[in-house]
Amino acid sequence: MSSPLASELSELAALRPGFRLSAPHARVAPRAATHARGRGRASHAGQPRLRSSCPGPSPGKRRVVPSGGAQPRVLPALSSRSHLFPMASHPQTRIQAYLEKNKIGPLFEELMTKLITETPDQPIPFLIDHLQSKQGNRGQLQRTLSGSAALWAESEKSESKGTRRDFRSYDKPWQLNAKKPKKSKSDLAVSNISPPSPDSKSLPRSVEHPKWNWRTKPQSRDFDELNHILQESKKLGKALENLSRSIAISDELDKETVTFNSSLLRPRVIGEWIGREENDADPLAAEMLQPPIPRSKNDQWESEDSGSSPAGSLKMEPKNKGLKQQQQQHKKLLAAMLSQDSFESIHSPTPSVTEEDIDNEDDAMELLEDLNDLRMEGVTTLVPSGSKFNQGRPTYPAEPQAKVTLNICSRCARLQGDNLEERTEESLPILHSPDEKIPDSFDSLPGTEEALMEEGDEFEKASKLTGPGEASSGVGHSLKNYMEEDESLKQLQVVHQPWILPSDTESEGVEAEQEKRSADLLLCVPCSSCPTLVYSGL
């Protein structure tokens, strides 16, 4: 009897699409269904039909339901086995559409996820509060998450406390029924309540992010703290960069100023200046006066803590300069000094040459051949005796020599001086004219014998005036004295003004002019043997 009933129900559903089934009518007794089927066969058009008002075994109770059309409809009672038949697909589709429209399945899934993840002590008030929070968001499309994604989204919601909401009410089909991750047992239990739609399987999973509104400041301090940390780190980075740059600049300045004073960067030099200013106007003059004191190879460098100022030491060269470069620089300095001296000597007007200047010049020339200077020049094979470098040069004693001024009287031909007073006292007085002069010294001058012969001629002239006896005796005595003192005169070195040779052929006007010219350079001194004035050189 069941197979005719199923075929009849399918026909009724096909002919009357507006016919609705309700769940209570599915539990009508079989006899009521049979009675309704019998009455439906005998019914005519336009007559009202009676139906059972409630499910039950008695077939007598009926209710009249107007169908809204010309013919009344009879609702057949379905058995409890109606879900096994093809007719059950229609209400199932309707229920599925209702659940999808109102998001019932995702709502229960979200509730179960919250219960599982948060596990409150009182689950019913917790669910009520959650549903009340959902009540104000009817325009918002709810999305469900499971697992860690749901926990993350819910933590974001709890932090925002409902301040950030999505007020966009348009449909977003790409976010409906997002694809779920692999479900746990609890998720499977929840999903059995409402199976997901087949369309949701192909949709990608989306994660709910709250909308950012620039007008409202978020209550969460996490972003502000992170931004503050980033700003502080940037400030610290800039400060460290500036500090490192300033340290590098100060290190460069210290290297420039302390390069010659640092014991680590101090180069090895052979000599050292003592008591010499660093910015000396004439460094070579100080070098001549104070030669460098050489160091031995075993001497160790003194520390800079000894208190010696850097101005008192030799200006150090950088460490990369070798000994050869120092030697070349020293030679250049010497060559510049020599060229400067030669330039000054050329352009200087009538330099006065004295014995002290010659002595100093000789000392300076000897200083260049000293062992210390040769060591500074880079000579390694040195002979301590020094005879190798001073051959052919006279040795000058350290003590100063006595200066002797010699004058020759033109009348008595006697030398005038402190060491020759005894000889001049023995000379004979001879009368002469005071206009004639004699040179201060002969000094190995070529033509000294001619000068002596001229003196002999003068004595002959004088003898004609005084007498033959006196003249012969005076001339012979004076010639004898000249021959004895000739050797001593040649050995003497006197540096004075140029002398004036006597002449017996000059007239008195010429002699007066020469006397006037020489008076500026010579000094008149009385002769010790005769009353003749002798011109002595200054």
Curated annotation (Swiss-Prot):
Protein name as it appears in the record: Uncharacterized protein C8orf34
Source organism per UniProt: Homo sapiens (Human)
The encoding gene: C8orf34
Source domain of life: Eukaryota
InterPro entries: DUF5586
Gene3D superfamilies: cAMP-dependent protein kinase regulatory subunit, dimerization-anchoring domain (1.20.890.10)
Alphabetized PANTHER family for the sequence: RIKEN CDNA A830018L16 GENE, SIMILAR TO HYPOTHETICAL PROTEIN
Stretches the record annotates as Disordered: 20-71, 151-211, 288-331, 458-482
Stretches with biased composition (Basic and acidic residues): 154-171
CDD domains per the UniProt record, alphabetical: DD_VEST1 (cd22980)
Consequence the record notes for mutating residue 161 to N: In a colorectal cancer sample; somatic mutation
